[in-house]
A protein has these predicted regions:
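DNA polymerase sliding clamps and clamp-related checkpoint/processivity subunits
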Residues: 1-31, 36-164, 169-270
Length: 270
């Protein structure tokens, strides 16, 4: 077992961004899927990788130092964040607010200063950082070719409309994807389905698996991460998760890796 992270030799850093509202949405998304995790902070930016309790959803965040007006730490440091604590602060942010985040040299807390555009509202807060043991999640390299893009607003609508269904089936072809309410063995009578890209009935599927609908519903917040946001869908092979990639305004990117639940043997052909 790896030794616990020593948070005593701490390295200071700070950043200022006008994309505070998008970071608020990101904090909500992280809280809904991950309990706690270390963030790596270095001269390239801030990196967070963590999974839900069942490890069926893995989220990978990259925030760019160059887009955050960041003064990086003198060397790479790790900060242990409880995401429910982070969201308690971030939920106070309103549209057009700016955000200053800092950590003083030798401190075990992360400081937040929320400012509005008129500079007549200024809120200070902090969270305590926590000792968290790293989980070694690795992600495979996916082909650069995108299967298709999905409007984030449509993804949010679809997950909300199907929230009462326990399962959803995802079928992938070379240039398209279809989401179906229910499982192949028990499709819902409503016949709800959504297609993106150039999915065609009659063509063989590369992939067909069953997912818990709540797993997808907890990702609906991706719609708020950027203006006119789109999700890029990538597929590697039958044994690896589906990859969804989203911009985080102009300051970073989010990759989500979702794995299916096992309900029954599912045919891979239409």
């Amino acid at each position: 077992m790896a030794a616990p992270i020593d948070v005593k030799p701490k390295h200071g850093f700070s950043l200022v961004t006008s994309s505070a509202y998008h970071l608020k949405i990101l904090s909500d998304l992280l809280k809904s899927n991950i309990k706690e995790q270390n963030a790596r902070v270095n001269n390239k930016g801030i990196f967070i990788r963590g999974a839900d309790e069942k490890e069926n959803t893995l989220i990978d965040v990259e925030l760019y130092a160059s887009a955050l007006n960041m003064e990086p730490p003198s060397s790479e440091t790790k900060i242990g964040i409880v995401f429910s604590h982070l969201h308690e602060i971030m939920r106070r942010i309103k549209r057009k607010d700016s955000l200053h985040i800092s950590r003083d040299e030798g401190s075990d807390q992360l400081n937040f200063n929320i400012m509005n555009a008129e500079k007549d509202r200024d809120k200070d807060a902090f969270i305590r950082l926590k000792d968290i043991q790293d989980d070694p999640w690795d992600v495979p390299v996916y082909p650069e070719q995108v299967i298709c893009t999905i409007p984030a607003s449509e993804f949010q609508r679809m997950t909300k409309e199907n929230a009462k269904q326990k399962y959803m089936t995802i079928r992938i072809q070379k240039r398209g994807v279809k989401f179906i309410a229910g499982t192949p063995q028990q499709p819902q009578l409503s016949g709800m389905e959504d297609r993106y890209g150039k999915y065609k009935d009659g063509e063989d599927d590369l992939y067909c698996r069953v997912f818990e609908t709540k797993q997808l519903t907890k990702l609906a917040k991706v719609n708020g991460l950027a203006t006119n946001n789109f999700l890029k869908l990538y597929w590697l092979d039958d044994e690896h998760p589906i990859k969804l990639e989203s911009a985080i305004d102009l300051i970073g990117r989010l990759c989500i890796y979702i794995s299916p639940v096992v309900v029954a043997q599912v045919p891979t052909a239409q």
